[in-house]
Curated annotation (Swiss-Prot):
<feature type="coiled-coil region">
    <location>
        <begin position="15"/>
        <end position="69"/>
    </location>
</feature>
<protein>
    <recommendedName>
        <fullName>Coiled-coil domain-containing protein 190</fullName>
    </recommendedName>
</protein>
<feature type="compositionally biased region" description="Polar residues">
    <location>
        <begin position="101"/>
        <end position="120"/>
    </location>
</feature>
<feature type="compositionally biased region" description="Polar residues">
    <location>
        <begin position="135"/>
        <end position="144"/>
    </location>
</feature>
<feature type="region of interest" description="Disordered">
    <location>
        <begin position="80"/>
        <end position="144"/>
    </location>
</feature>
<dbReference type="InterPro" id="IPR031525">
    <property type="entry name" value="CC190"/>
</dbReference>
<feature type="region of interest" description="Disordered">
    <location>
        <begin position="183"/>
        <end position="241"/>
    </location>
</feature>
<dbReference type="Pfam" id="PF15768">
    <property type="entry name" value="CC190"/>
</dbReference>
<keyword id="KW-0175">Coiled coil</keyword>
<feature type="compositionally biased region" description="Basic and acidic residues">
    <location>
        <begin position="201"/>
        <end position="221"/>
    </location>
</feature>
Amino acid sequence: MERHMVRGPLHKHFDLERKSAKQAEARLSQRLQRLEDICLYHVKSLTREQRQLQKELQRLQQDIIKKKLCSYFGNRSQKRPEDVLTLSSQGGQKHRALQANKASALTTNTTQGRSKTKSQMPPFHHIGPKDPMKSKQQALSQNNRTSHFIEEKLQAQEKESINPPKGKGSNESISLLCHNQDVSTHTVDGGPGSGPAGDSEPGHSDETRSNDASTRPDHNPAKQTPLDPVEGGGDFKDKPQTSTYLELFEKARKAHYLRHRVPPESERLLSIAEIFGHKESSQSRAEKGCENRVTI
């Protein structure tokens, strides 16, 4: 009987615990369901907002493209002939600057080539006495002619680029520039100082060329490049030959620098006795060093 009395309240206690556990599980399942519903709602709202934002972004991009196209076509339709003239004048100025640079580079290259050929040519005997002043005047007159010819052609090309005639294109102007450059090279290479034929010409042609050089003044002296380094006339034998950079470099490399036989007192290595305060040894060594220097 006692056992049955004890088992009765235990069974009741277990039943109550089971009921409470089941109720807690039911409550937890309900809360989980609510949380899942809330998550689904938020996900759906986020997807909806994302779609709306994508649509607005596409619409804004289309509006920007339309505005750019409208502004581009509007500027093209509203462009005036004055703007076209300014653009063409700017292009002509750039083209003229390029032409001037090409002409100056061509003249410098031709003068350098002539000087190199002169230095490399072997000496030969001329018939009759050679006057250095006449050859110098002939070279200057020829240089003046070429520079004046190039200036006239450049001015004519500038006028044509500002007011281009009908029926002429850019190809004709380019061919004209190439032809002018060829003519200038032929005139510079065919001068009196380029070969023996120019030195053996008669005196009448020399006089006419000097007269032409005196009558035609040079408007641009900065473009002239002197062909002869001698200014006052005469032969090169009177002028001393200056040594080049390579020769000076070789001399400096071969030079030997002297040094004292005995190192100075500041560079002498101290011994342990001198470091720890033995002054007598340091003084005696200093006296010996002075005596050695005096004997040297």
